[in-house]
């Protein structure tokens, strides 16, 4: 028996990285919508207040977003904190293998968007979770919502980890301290809690976060600024640095530095070998490469809302927007990884920006980049938290009236859990690895393929047709990558051989 189509309203809200959690609100009739508005006056309205009393339906919504702005919005959705870990990924794969893997993930991401657009065109649904509902009923919707929620939690965790990692260095620079001191305002754990309570939580408790949508452009600008700084610093930082020759755990004692300076003077061949790039590398940390790349390319839940906002929409036009956005991010990712790697080689840490503190803690350019990135991620966290809270409302409290107590408790509980994760996580690599190995393969590979297989009518494409066979193979690749990545990461943890950069 065919599941009846649902009429959906989708709200497009550009923000720093993630629109993933935008959850559609069912709108079967105008009367029921007015009743729901009375009940859910807080969460139900979304980020931006509507100027019109009539909410848009996907069937009658007239998009007004141009081609260029849609490319900007989708590029903004792709871009995120994942760019900070790509140089570390290149250090553990080599330039050639990294380029191959980055190209493969980009092409596969484009193909999965193609599957999503074809599926949405068949059933007239432009919301990721509702495609899951159309394909597998409530379990499909819940699975998609869970994956999107995990992805958003991973994004918030990575943002808070950047605050934990970078804010002490900014304070150290402003106080003109050569070395960090054991005081509370230099402790990243205290600082991330302080920022969460004083700045993030009050913003997350607001009913409307529309004005924070402007952080969208600011966040993307910060990452472009970061890329320019990385390229510039490649030609300013000499190689070799004594700091670079220690292991990536960040243990830079004075004695080690002196010994290594002596070693460099007596053994120039060692220095030359260190400053020679690797083109193909396999080690225990290579297992993190694909998850980091997958984390960096997740934008699929945003594709359909952006499609809804597009002026004169068509699948072909939206596919061109997706291809162009992925291509732009592909170039930015490769340049950031390449120049970051060629600056520090094997000394690069899992959070690239933190590595520059080993060169010159008082560098003005890097300080400006740090401050800009800190402001961007701090403003982005409450925006990313909003759809996660809404997902919880939709799944657990769908038919209940808005409650301030529940509103506050959900936000506080989420921030508490994420803070605990950030405090006890040894480095950002673990966050990139786990989220990139679980929710990212589901959103990029598995769900688009199986949704397409289920939704596409057999009259148009039989079960054994080439497109459906390719879709199943695509899903199988996703399962394989997820299983392999998780296996390698867990093995790395259990064996205790992990030497992640960026411990603080």
Curated annotation (Swiss-Prot):
| InterPro entries found in the cross-reference section | AA_transpt_TM (IPR013057)
Q: What is its main location?
A: membrane
**Result for mutant: residue 370 to Q:** Does not affect L-glutamine transport activity. Does not affect cell membrane localization
Instruction: Summarize what activates or inhibits it.
Output: L-glutamine efflux and L-glutamine uptake are regulated by CO2/HCO3(-) through SLC4A4 leading to modulation of cytosolic pH and Na(+)concentration.
**Activity sensitivity to pH:** Optimum pH is 8.
Q: What is the effect of changing residue 32 to A?
A: Does not affect phosphorylation by PKC
Q: What induces it?
A: Induced by chronic metabolic acidosis (CMA).
| Mutation effect (residue 76 to S) | Abolishes glutamine transport activity. Increases the alkali-induced substrate-independent conductance. Does not affect cell membrane localization
User: At what positions is Phosphoserine found?
Assistant: 52
Describe PTMs of this protein.
Answer: Phosphorylation at Ser-52 induces internalization and sequestration into an intracellular reservoir. During dephosphorylation by protein phosphatases, can recycle back to the plasma membrane and regain activity. Prolonged phosphorylation results in its degradation.
Residues carrying covalently attached carbohydrate according to the record: 73, 247, 251, 323
Reactions catalysed: L-glutamine(out) + Na(+)(out) + H(+)(in) = L-glutamine(in) + Na(+)(in) + H(+)(out); L-asparagine(out) + Na(+)(out) + H(+)(in) = L-asparagine(in) + Na(+)(in) + H(+)(out); L-histidine(out) + Na(+)(out) + H(+)(in) = L-histidine(in) + Na(+)(in) + H(+)(out)
Which tissues express it?
Highly expressed in liver. Expressed in skeletal muscle. Expressed in kidney, heart and brain. Not detected in gut, lung or spleen. Expressed ubiquitously in hepatocytes in liver whereas in kidney expression is restricted to the medulla. Within brain, expressed in glial cells. In the cerebellum, expressed on Bergmann glial fibers in the molecular layer and astrocytes in the granule layer. Expressed in brain kidney and liver (at protein level). In the adult kidney, highly expressed in the outer strip of the outer medulla and medullary rays penetrating into the kidney cortex (at protein level).
Quick one: a GO cellular component term?
Answer: membrane
In its UniProt record, a GO molecular function of this protein is: L-glutamine, sodium:proton antiporter activity
TM regions (residue ranges)? 82-102, 105-125, 143-163, 186-206, 212-232, 287-307, 324-344, 366-386, 408-428, 431-451, 469-489
Instruction: Give the record's keywords alphabetically.
Output: Amino-acid transport, Antiport, Cell membrane, Disulfide bond, Glycoprotein, Ion transport, Membrane, Phosphoprotein, Sodium, Sodium transport, Symport, Transmembrane, Transmembrane helix, Transport
Question: What happens on changing residue 343 to A?
Answer: Does not affect L-glutamine transport activity. Does not affect cell membrane localization
- Which cell locations does it reside in? Cell membrane; Basolateral cell membrane
Site entry: Modulates L-glutamine-induced conductances and Na(+) binding: 76
Q: To which protein family does this belong?
A: Belongs to the amino acid/polyamine transporter 2 family.
State the protein's purpose. Symporter that cotransports specific neutral amino acids and sodium ions, coupled to an H(+) antiporter activity. Mainly participates in the glutamate-GABA-glutamine cycle in brain where it transports L-glutamine from astrocytes in the intercellular space for the replenishment of both neurotransmitters glutamate and gamma-aminobutyric acid (GABA) in neurons. Also functions as the major influx transporter in ganglion cells mediating the uptake of glutamine. The transport activity is specific for L-glutamine, L-histidine and L-asparagine.
Query: In its UniProt entry, what is this protein called?
Result: Sodium-coupled neutral amino acid transporter 3
In its UniProt entry, the species of origin is given as Rattus norvegicus (Rat)
For this protein's source organism, the top of the classification is: Eukaryota, Metazoa, Chordata, Craniata, Vertebrata
């Amino acid at each position: 028996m065919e599941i009846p189509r649902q009429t959906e309203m989708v709200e497009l809200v550009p923000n720093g990285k993630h629109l993933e959690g935008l959850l559609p609100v069912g709108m079967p009739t105008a009367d029921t919508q007015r009743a729901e508005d009375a009940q859910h006056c807080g969460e139900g309205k979304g980020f931006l207040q509507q100027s019109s009393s009539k909410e848009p339906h996907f069937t009658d919504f007239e998009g007004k977003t141009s081609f260029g702005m849609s490319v900007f919005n989708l590029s903004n959705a792709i871009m995120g904190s994942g760019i900070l870990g790509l140089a570390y990924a290149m250090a553990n794969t080599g330039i050639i293998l990294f380029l191959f893997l980055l190209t493969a993930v980009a092409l596969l991401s484009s193909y999965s968007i193609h599957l999503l657009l074809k599926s949405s065109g068949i059933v007239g649904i432009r919301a990721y979770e509702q495609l899951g509902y159309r394909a597998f009923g409530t379990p499909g919707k819940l699975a998609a919502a869970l994956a999107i929620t995990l992805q958003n939690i991973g994004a918030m965790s990575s943002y808070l980890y950047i605050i934990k990692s970078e804010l002490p260095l900014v304070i150290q620079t402003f106080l003109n301290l050569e070395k960090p001191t054991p005081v509370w305002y230099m402790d990243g754990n205290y600082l991330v809690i302080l920022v969460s309570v004083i700045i993030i939580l009050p913003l997350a408790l607001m009913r409307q976060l529309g004005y924070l949508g402007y952080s969208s452009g600011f966040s993307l600008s910060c990452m472009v600024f970061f890329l320019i700084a990385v390229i510039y610093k490649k030609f300013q930082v000499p190689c070799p640095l004594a700091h670079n020759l220690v292991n990536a755990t960040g243990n830079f004692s004075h004695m080690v530095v002196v010994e290594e300076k002596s070693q460099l003077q007596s053994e120039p061949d060692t220095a030359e070998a260190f400053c020679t790039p690797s083109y193909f590398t396999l080690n225990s940390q290579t297992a993190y490469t694909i998850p980091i790349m997958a984390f960096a390319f997740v934008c699929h839940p945003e594709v359909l809302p952006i499609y809804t906002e597009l002026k004169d929409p068509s699948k072909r036009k939206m596919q061109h927007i997706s291809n162009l956005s992925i291509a732009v991010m592909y170039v930015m990712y490769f340049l950031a990884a390449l120049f970051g790697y060629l600056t520090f080689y094997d000394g690069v840490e899992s959070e690239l920006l933190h590595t520059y503190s080993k060169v010159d803690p008082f560098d003005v350019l890097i300080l400006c980049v740090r401050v800009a990135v800190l402001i961007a991620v701090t403003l982005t966290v409450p925006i990313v938290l909003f759809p996660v809270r809404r997902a919880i409302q939709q799944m657990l409290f769908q038919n209940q009236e808005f409650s301030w107590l529940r509103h506050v408790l959900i936000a506080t509980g989420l921030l508490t859990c994420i803070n605990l994760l950030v405090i006890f996580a040894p480095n950002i690599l673990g966050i990139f690895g786990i989220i990139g190995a679980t929710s990212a393969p589901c959103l990029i590979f598995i769900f688009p393929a199986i949704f397409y297989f289920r939704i596409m009518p057999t009259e148009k494409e039989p079960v054994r047709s080439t497109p459906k066979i390719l879709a199943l193979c695509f899903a199988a690749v996703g399962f394989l990558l997820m299983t392999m990545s998780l296996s390698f990461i867990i093995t790395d943890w259990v064996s205790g051989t992990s030497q992640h950069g960026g411990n603080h």
